[in-house]
Amino acid sequence: MEIWTVLEDFHKTRQLLENASNGVSHLWRFCFGGDLAKLVYRAKQDYREQFEDILRECPSLFDALNLGHQSHFNQRISRALDFTTPGRTTAAVAFFAFIFDKWSQETHFSRDYQLDFLAVALWRTWKCQRLNAIPATCRYSR
């Protein structure tokens, strides 16, 4: 349930994504990242093949993100997240960390922009689902 507490705060969500990414060294993650970041990193490694399969179903996702288009990401990825259990929530965060790693390899955007975009999308989706408000108040329309 600690993961749900972290997702309540945007800055903690951003920090968790960063600490679970490949952009942070193993030593940093071990010493300063915290147990949750280590768990998310491990889940990201364990589910790597499944995450690759999901991204293959959205072949133009990174092209759209690199052009600044967010609607495709929000409709295809964010809406599909499941936060019903701590395990599924961990997998959702691991998937976003995986996307962050993949996107970092093929973009002209800064690492901070990517991290902010993904953290906002994750945090906002979490908040909307917790409020059971996705159909009405949290529609992504860009």
UniProtKB/Swiss-Prot annotation:
Major localisation: host cell
One annotated GO biological process: symbiont-mediated suppression of host apoptosis
GO cellular component: host cell nuclear lamina; host cell plasma membrane; membrane
Alphabetized PROSITE patterns for the sequence: BCL2_FAMILY
Biological role: Putative adenovirus Bcl-2 homolog that inhibits apoptosis induced by TNF or FAS pathways, as well as p53-mediated apoptosis. Without E1B 19K function, virus production is compromised because of premature death of host cell. Interacts with Bax protein in cell lysates.
Sequence similarity: Belongs to the adenoviridae E1B 19 kDa protein family.
Name of the protein in its database record: E1B protein, small T-antigen
Species per Swiss-Prot/TrEMBL record: Human adenovirus E serotype 4 (HAdV-4)
